Amino acid sequence: MVRKIKSQYIALDKQNKVALGNAISCLKELADDSVDFIITDPPYNLGLFMKKRGTNMDKLRNGHFAASGWDDLNFEDWTKEMDKLFSECHRVLKEKGNLIMFMSIIKVETIIGLAEKHKFY
């Protein structure tokens, strides 16, 4: 299960605001084609690798991720959550809007596949 985070909105001026929180939850509150720019840093789902730097590499490469409390979904569940994120990003972004997503190099292939599915390429 993905950890629930309370959303916060910070007004930059009368027209622009920054949303801090679970990206999927925040995006669901927005209208279609209403966003110019999204920057998100979703869980990499690398578990203990992020804590111990360099441990469990064989398991990481085989899609078996260790638990770390906030980053412990199995690969299939993580992929479903990322699919939801891409779907919401595509829905709310304006035609010439931009998405920047931080992600581990280990997940690039999956991320590119989801981006293509949701017409970011």
Regions found by a protein language model. Give the residues of each.
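S-adenosyl-L-methionine-dependent nucleic acid methyltransferase catalytic domains
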Residues: 1-121
